[in-house]
Design a protein with these regions (language model features):
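Hydrophobic anchor position in alpha-helical repeat solenoids
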Residues: 63-65, 192, 239, 282, ...
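Bacterial N-terminal signal peptides that target proteins for export
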Residues: 2-13
């Protein structure tokens, strides 16, 4: 990890800008300002902005940031933010998992989950794709999501056995390998594939990989408009990220060499036709597979540094908006890229950390030897 030194002058500059940025949750586009800042300065600017404003963000966003910062740094102060996430998802798992045997519950809650997809172009495409699989959203984006996160923290959640039984009885393969589904949300599907294997309810990896490659053959890249090209690249990064337990473990590059080779060959189009979060993930894909010296990493870093706006102390959205709630994802990714550690940290296993152990929700039970278990 870089040794990040800050002069007093820089610190006061950042602090002053942070105080200004605390009111910057702009809904209107902001004009980005050019700069000559270093990677270190960009890293600290984003960090100061996010951590100053963290408690104004939704619990889900606080948890997302804290989990990733713990896995990058191992600093236990980030365990408290992760605890906020656990408290939230444990209550939700209790509601969903403990009602699975209630007549009509799966059908009604699945419909609610689908309705939340929205009515924009992407939401409509996803609703159309998921129509043949009416219960898939509940199984995947609710049950698998919450159970896998509880598991990552070293616990089993409420009504665990009923949830596992329900998911084992649900054949997710048709939805996961459907071409329209992959075209609608490739990255999310590989997440579901990983989570299903993680909690022991099904191994869909090879089937999904084959379906993904058939959906996006490299020979037909020239036929992909920007939206579909972004979806392809985003999906490819998540093959690697899911294999890492989402930044908990280094990844053997051999299984994913087909992805790394593709990124290296197509980096110029990736930099042109995708967005900052996807571009940053491409760079991280090389770092997490031990390929930090690959020229792609330097290209991505230069792009990300140039995308930083010093006035708002963040990387703006593709539409130029400075909303921290929706922009935390791309900005914490930028932090990770610019200060990648020598060692990744598992968990956090909240039952093993003094500051969180005494505040755990009663709804979860510690797993045996969680800290000694590789979840995948």
């Amino acid at each position: 990890m870089l040794v990040l030194h800050k002069s007093k002058a820089l610190w006061y500059l950042l602090l002053s800008a942070t105080l200004f940025s605390s009111v910057v949750f702009a809904t209107k586009p902001v004009e980005k300002v050019a700069h000559n800042l270093t990677s270190e300065q960009v890293y600290h600017g984003i960090k100061a902005n996010l951590e100053t404003n963290l408690y104004s963000l939704p619990p889900r966003v606080q948890g997302h940031y804290a989990i990733r910062q713990f896995r990058m740094t191992g600093e236990t102060k980030y365990a408290n933010g992760s605890l906020i996430d656990l408290l939230t998802i444990a209550e939700r798992q209790a509601y969903y998992s403990c009602n699975l045997d209630k007549p009509g519950f799966i059908k009604s809650e699945s419909k609610i989950a689908v309705d939340k997809l929205g009515n924009g172009p992407r939401g409509q495409a996803r609703k159309k794709a998921i129509a043949p699989y009416p219960n898939f959203m509940l199984y995947s984006n609710v049950l698998l999501r919450y159970a896998s996160r509880v598991d990552e923290f070293g616990f089993t959640g409420p009504c665990h056995d009923l949830m596992i039984k329900t998911l084992k009885n649900a054949n997710l393969a048709p939805a996961l390998t459907d071409k329209q589904m992959i075209q609608a949300w490739a990255a999310q599907l590989i997440n579901y594939v990983y989570w299903a294997k993680q909690i022991g309810v099904g191994d869909y990896y090879e089937a999904y990989k084959k379906a993904f490659i058939n959906t996006y053959p490299n020979s037909k890249d020239d036929q992909l408009e920007k939206g579909q090209y972004k979806n392809k690249i985003y999906g490819m990064t998540h093959f690697i990220f899911s294999a890492s337990g989402y930044y908990q473990y280094p990844v053997d590059p051999k299984e994913h060499q087909w992805i790394l080779d593709y990124f290296e060959k197509n980096i110029d189009r990736i930099l042109t036709d995708t967005t900052e979060d996807i571009i940053t993930e491409v760079g991280i894909s090389f770092l997490i597979t031990g390929n930090g010296s690959n020229p792609v990493v330097d290209k991505v870093k230069k792009h990300v540094i140039a995308a930083y706006d010093p006035n708002t102390m963040m990387i703006l959205s593709p539409h130029g908006k400075a909303d921290l709630s929706s922009g935390e994802h791309r900005n914490v990714l930028a932090m990770m890229l610019l200060d990648w550690p020598d060692t990744l940290h598992k968990g956090p296993y909240l039952n093993d950390i003094a500051s969180t152990k005494k505040h755990l929700p009663k709804l979860v039970k510690p797993k045996a030897s969680a800290s000694d278990t590789k979840l995948h």
